Amino acid sequence: MSLLKYYQKLDDAVAYLFSSTINEKKLLNQFFKNKEITFVDIGTNMGNYLSFIQKNFKIKNAYCFEPINELCENLQKKHGKNVKIFNCALSNKEKKRKFYIYEIPSQSSFYKQNKTYSSLQKIKKIIKIESKIFDKIFNKNLKIDFCKIDAQGEDFQILKGMSKNLKKGNIKLLKVEVCFPDVHKDVPNSYLDILNYLNKFN
């Protein structure tokens, strides 16, 4: 099962963000209440969503992917028990690419911001990072209860890299946070591309 959230208007998205933990807790309780779960967090950033999951559900194992070194160090200190931190990005190809780290860490991405959101545009630094493929890391038929993807424009490429696990039904619940179409430059996909792709596996 897939859960996608997409809003055309920024105001609607902000309203959702302030209510999302309440809504999502109700939804996730339908699947995972009183159960130990295996959780994968792609784009963990500062760990806010991971903290929400740890607070409200029993975690058997958590696998977190975050390409920014400094954030990974903090995540390991704060969430070490039952949590494995991967200091890398995911995509559908293994190769080195530019990664833009913004003053607001949650905006960091493989893609530069458009001028539409100038308040989010301050680049702190640009680094080169190696992207890895989900299916090559999770290649032992691990059953994943819940996988969340929030990758600032790279979401579709990540999904392509997890096609084997999707085909095998190894992921019970999938949440993908899709960016506004005008936030980043040169993002090679749209919301409909992602939706149509995921429909192949239902």
Q: What positions do the PLM features span?
A:
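S-adenosyl-L-methionine
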Residues: 4-11, 15
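Conserved acidic-Pro-Pro-aromatic motif
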Residues: 40, 52-64, 82, 137-149, ...
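Conserved residues in the N-terminal Rossmann fold of short-chain dehydrogenase/reductase
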Residues: 87-88, 128-131, 148
